[in-house]
């Protein structure tokens, strides 16, 4: 199993205490030392090598997003998210004690001090901002560079495993930030670009492949659903927890989305056997679709002891799903990390493939 990681992921600082660099630190250190088929991609400039293989609309959306991120004003305190200037119109608990604040009135010795928590905001590294009215996914001065590094990582992982117009190896992307909550006009849930969708489009456009995306993250892949619905050569199967007021609030299995979208709501405390049985129950539909490749959105937040504490799966589940798909369909499989906020769970899930 070839494993790839975006070298600059540890430069990415999110607004959450969950989506943090340390969740991947132990497994990255282990792979660097012990696994010869592990590659960290440092390139971040030549994103157009990848974008040229995408549809024109996808290229425009990505370039527009990168431009927006690289030209943003960073006006929130990274520690408490106090806003410098006029408050955002959206009501949010982060701003419940806030009041309009003139940035020039809170300067001490030429330093900008956060009025709420008294932290320095002079250094741009200590500031962030949010996309439109979204307050769960922040970005700062280098977010666009981290995303460019991720795009280059995807491109490299694909081309290194393609030979004679065929995908010849399985591989894994051990990367952050995740992607399955993002779509063309949505930055949400720690996600900025939808990596599994972009990979599917590369494979469809270059190899004329049919792609089956299977999302097993705890949360519904709402961004992926938006991107793939009614698209030719794509089938999307999403197993996730669904409950009132549980993020992102989409993915009700009782609601029809599109012929190529299958949502399955998993019960709380579901275990390996429940996921395997559910995936297997969709094999007839998958067989009728006859994919050339599987892409698995690998969310380790369904594993026992994750901070969400909803599902009770083991760290071997994804390897079991991998083996089941291999045995049944004998197709190449790409795994892409999504959520999962207990470092040991991510570490041991990856090690199960080595």
Feature locations, PLM:
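HDAC/HDAC-like amidohydrolase catalytic core signature
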Residues: 1-354
């Amino acid at each position: 199993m070839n494993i790839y990681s975006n070298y600059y992921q540890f430069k990415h600082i999110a607004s959450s205490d969950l989506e943090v660099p340390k969740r991947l630190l132990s497994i990255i250190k282990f792979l660097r030392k012990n696994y010869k088929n592990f590659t960290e991609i440092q390139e971040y400039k030549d994103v157009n090598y990848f974008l040229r293989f995408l549809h024109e609309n996808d290229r425009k959306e990505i370039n527009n997003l990168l431009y927006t991120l690289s030209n943003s004003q960073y006006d929130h305190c990274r520690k408490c998210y106090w806003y410098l200037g006029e408050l955002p119109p959206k009501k949010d608990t982060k701003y419940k004690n806030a009041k309009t604040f003139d940035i020039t009135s809170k300067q001490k010795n030429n330093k900008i001090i956060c009025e709420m928590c008294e932290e320095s905001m002079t250094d741009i590294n200590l500031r962030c901002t949010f996309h439109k009215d979204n307050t769960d996914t922040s970005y700062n001065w280098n977010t666009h560079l981290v995303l460019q590094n991720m795009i280059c990582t995807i491109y490299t992982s694909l081309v290194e495993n393609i030979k004679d117009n065929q995908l010849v190896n399985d591989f894994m992307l051990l990367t952050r930030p995740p992607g399955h909550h993002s779509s063309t006009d949505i930055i949400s849930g720690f996600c900025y670009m939808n990596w599994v969708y972009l990979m599917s489009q590369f494979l469809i456009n270059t190899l004329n492949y049919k792609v089956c995306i299977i999302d097993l993250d705890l949360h519904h892949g709402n961004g992926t659903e938006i991107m793939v619905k009614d698209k030719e050569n794509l089938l999307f199967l999403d197993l996730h927890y669904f409950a009132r007021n549980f993020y992102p609030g989409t993915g009700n299995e009782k609601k029809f989305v599109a012929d190529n979208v299958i949502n399955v709501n998993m019960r709380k405390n579901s275990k390996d056997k429940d996921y395997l049985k559910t995936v297997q129950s969709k094999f007839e539909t998958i067989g009728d679709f006859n994919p050339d490749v599987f892409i698995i959105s690998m969310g380790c937040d369904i594993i026992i002891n994750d901070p969400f504490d909803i599902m009770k799966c083991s760290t071997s589940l994804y390897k079991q799903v991998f083996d089941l798909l291999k045995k049944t369909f004998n197709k190449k499989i790409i795994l892409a990390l999504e959520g999962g906020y207990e470092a040991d769970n991510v570490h041991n899930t990856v090690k199960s493939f080595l």
